[in-house]
Amino acid sequence: MTTQIYQVPVVSNGLRETESILQIVDSLEKLEKVFNDMYSTISARVSHEKSRIDNVANRLNNAQHKVNQIVGSKQAITVFSSAKYPADKKWGDYVPIYSGKHKLPFKPSHYHGLNSEDSPIKKRPEDSYLDVNDLVFIEKSIDTTSKEVEVKEGLGRIPAQIPSVSNLLLFNTQENPYKKYSNTLDNLSGGDGGEDDYTIFGDQLSKKKRLGDAPVTVKDGDSRIDAENVKIGYEPGTFEIPVYNFPSILPLPNVAENITWAAESQSIAPSQKATLNLLPTYDNSNSGSAPVNQSSGGDNNVNNNNNNNNSNNSTGIMQPPQPTNAPPPPPPPPQSANAPPPPPPPPVSAPPPFNPPSVNSNNDDDDDDDDDNGGGGGPGGAIGDLLADIRRGHKNRLKKADVGGDNGDGEDNKPPPVSDGGGGLMGDLFKKLALRRQSIATTKSTKKQSKSKKEDTDDQDGESDTDSSEWE
């Protein structure tokens, strides 16, 4: 769409005076309207662009004011940037001023007569045009006399289509061949100097211009440079590196001094400070009860062993040491309804009296020997036997029962009562335990007899030694 939307009528020639005046007035009015419209449009665009410039200037002033407030402060400053990076600015196409306006229709002025009434045009005599013809002739004669007579000395008229000014000039000269041209002018012909270097060009003498020297590739040819004689490697020189001593903090202007400043704001990842309870926590009192009881039980066993050893040493009988690293006893099995309740524990104040070894040993000795051998000496099985483990679990209860039998009841050699309700798992286990105890009792009785004989011989040897020492 064309941007030329205004049209101004031009006063035509050959009109009467009144028509000429009216057309002149119409043309001036139209020109004034066009002028006002153009300048109002331009003023509106200028004011719009000026408002944009003022907005940018205000933003610059605000930024400069903030910078001026920061300048001079020696404290560290936190600068917060937007979370989203600003998008690329989209530059819009330039909109012309008159792009939204359309070309106005042209209304020429038409005047046909001086009178307002419709009257036919009267033919004027030819004498009335003589003065006008004289004026036209005089104007033409003035134009012809003012023009210079063109002399045909060049190549002719300048062509209508010339791409540039360089095409208008002669090569390597500043002369226009279309205006002045000499056939004797030859820039390529060399001269020896003197008068031959000057050529008559028109009425002036023009000095011939020599061409520049040919390039090296034309003079010497396409010869390649010898690469062996050319050093293209880097050869650094030896020099001492300067040593500078600067303080840790330079007193520079407009530079923060508190380098070790720490932000007081909340971290962007607060979950790092939280401690996660990934592992279960245990109470120290509950968790340490088992090992404490175990250690206390071990200490009690050690004390009991020491007491037994001391008592045995006092009577001259050596007892085998009891195991102190025995595993903790398993929980007791559930008792049946027909089983009698366990006997009460013995009094703690007075320990039970020690009985000398004899052929018919009690069940408490059997239990001690069984503990020493670990259940591996009998014909029943090995240490890891299930029945032996169950028996070890009931060791304390059985010992209490045996201690109660030493008071003279005479029932310490009897096996524990077995429930008559056959077919149950616990009943079978108790039967197996009874058989096991009987087999162990028979084997232990023989061991006790051999052991007592050995101790008697040792006592006799000791008495003989004392007698010999007395005689000496």
Swiss-Prot record:
GO terms for biological process: actin filament polymerization; actin nucleation; Arp2/3 complex-mediated actin nucleation; defense response to Gram-negative bacterium; endocytic recycling; exocytosis; lysosomal transport; phagosome reneutralization. InterPro entries: WASH1, WASH1_WAHD, WH2_dom. Residues 374-383 have a biased composition (Gly residues). One of its GO terms (molecular function) is gamma-tubulin binding. Residues 363-373, 457-472 have a biased composition (Acidic residues). Residues 320-356 have a biased composition (Pro residues). Residues 382-401 form the WH2 domain. Residues 300-314 have a biased composition (Low complexity). Keywords: Actin-binding. It comes from the Eukaryota. Residues 279-472 are annotated as: Disordered. It holds the Pfam family WASH_WAHD. Residues 282-299 have a biased composition (Polar residues). Acts as a nucleation-promoting factor by activating the Arp2/3 complex to induce actin polymerization. Belongs to the WASH1 family. This is WAS protein family homolog DDB_G0292878. It comes from Dictyostelium discoideum.
